[in-house]
Each structure stands twice: as C-alpha cells, then as structure tokens.
Amino acid sequence: MTVIDNHEALAEDGEMSEASARDYFELLKPRVMSLVVFTAFAGLVLAPGHINPVLGLIAILCIAVGAGASGALNMWYDADIDAIMSRTAKRPIPAGRIAPSEALAFGLVLSGFSVVILGLAVNWLSAAILAFTIFFYAVIYTMWLKRSTPQNIVIGGAAGAFPPMIGWACVTNSVTIESTVLFLIIFLWTPAHFWALALFKMRDYEAVGVPMLPNVSGERVTKHQIVAYAVLTAICAVLPSFLGFASFGYGLVAAALGAIFVYCSIAVWRMPDGDLKMIPAKKLFAFSIFYLFAVFSALMIDRLAAILVSQAGGSF
C-alpha cells in the first residue's frame, strides 16, 4: 500500500489567501475539542475533593487549548492527505487559507502555552499528562502510527482517552484506578467509533494509502473487531458501579446504553460485505458519539445527586 507523503507539494506561504480567525479556529478541530472539554470536565466533577472554580475554569481552558493545539499539529502534518480526501479537502491548509508553517507555529505556541499555564495555575502532574497527550497525538499517532499500521486507531486512541484523567489529576494531583477506568471507557470506545467511520470512508483512506483496518484486513475482520470493542466498552462503562464511585442506578443506565451500543455494532456485523450504502455503519458512528456523551453525563449526574443527598443528610 502506497502512503501519500507529499508535504513539499503544498502551497508556500506566499501563495496563501488571507486567513481569518475562523480558519485558525478550524485548525483546532472544534468538534473533537468539544468532546475533550466535556470528558475533561467530567473528570473534574467526578474526582473526590474540591477545586477553586476559577482554577477549574483555567484547567478546562488549558485542556481545550492543548487539545486544539494537537489538532493544529495534526492538520499541519496531514495536509497532504487532507487535500485528497473528500471530507477533509476544505480544511484551511489544503484549501490554501493557512500556510503549513503558520499552522505549525500556531500549534507549537498553543501547546507550550497550555501546558505551562496548567502547571503554574493548577499542578504539574496534570500539565505533564497534557504534554504527553499532545505529544502522543501529534507525534506517536499522527506522524507514526496513522500511516504505518491498521492498529493506528487502537493505540492512537489513548490520546483521546486522557482528558478525564487530566481533569481528575487537576483536582487530586494523582492518577487513580477510578481515573484509569474513565480512560479505559474512551480508549475501548474509540476503535468501534472510528472503524465504523472507516467502513463508509474506505475509498478515501485507500486513495491516500492510510492503512485503516477495513482496507488492510477487509470488512469482515473489521466488523468482528467492532463488535468485540463495543462489548468491551459496554462492560467497562458499568465498572464505576462495581468500584464504588457510581451508584447502582448509574450502572443500570450504563448497561442499557451499552446494550444499544452492542446492538448497533451487531447490525454492522450483519451488514453484507460490499454494501454501498453502509447505513448500519453510519448509524453506529452517530450513536457512538451520543453513547459517550450519555455515559459521562450519567456519571456526572450520579455524582451530583450523591453530593446533594449527602448534604441533605441522607444516603445514596
């Protein structure tokens, strides 16, 4: 499989049209950043103890900026293949609105800024995890794994799983079994989510030589893997109840959501190979986003309910 690597063919700075603030905001991958902010906030809420609201806001902003910075570095490196893929061709760099060198500088400055401010304002453990997350996504995943192995999403998914752990560390200045479970929920969720996308975007990935699992091992293997990871995610999502940092009620909600997630993955598994419409894969991709938001929302609601009951003198 030939991997596209044509960064030098991109337009030089002088050939760029004038960039707007919106273009730079797009470099931050705002949709991805919103999920990062949400799960990091969940880590803050779920962690035992308290954090000054101002410091909590600074922490969330730093995590958001750090996530956006890694997105900018990803777009800088992937501009050559983004120009070919239909879903990414209109991004600021391949569209000629931002020069690659400007995107690189933007990403590096924001990376340093977010890590240093988080360390100075909150604690250096959370800053170190944020720095490692940026490095992992921009270098380990983007520059190495993405173009070299069909397991790119499995290993690279760790980058997207760190935010709740960072949020937790902002409050406790520690990494615990509870924050590790939050990490694992996202880590195990990522393959089913992205391989569903890879199924109905197979031709795009094939055109640029990115070795996604459907292109390397075929649809059938990918579908088996999607079901396996959906089951593992559903099991992991109920662990907070068994570990004592969420209620039995949360466990029931997580189990119900997990059952739907697995059902959607089985629908993909039953989908005939070569199906051009890929409707079950598209439905799984959409539901997987809702699933993750719903699980972390349920965890936060459960935590807030426990606090309210405790303050009222009851038990939960």
From Swiss-Prot:
Gene: ctaB
Swiss-Prot/TrEMBL catalytic activity: heme b + (2E,6E)-farnesyl diphosphate + H2O = Fe(II)-heme o + diphosphate
The species this protein was found in: Rhizobium etli (strain ATCC 51251 / DSM 11541 / JCM 21823 / NBRC 15573 / CFN 42)
EC number assigned by the record: 2.5.1.141
Keywords in alphabetical order: Cell inner membrane, Cell membrane, Heme biosynthesis, Membrane, Transferase, Transmembrane, Transmembrane helix
Gene Ontology biological process terms from the UniProt entry: heme O biosynthetic process
Any Pfam family the entry gives: UbiA
Record-given protein name: Protoheme IX farnesyltransferase
Topology term for the membrane: Multi-pass membrane protein
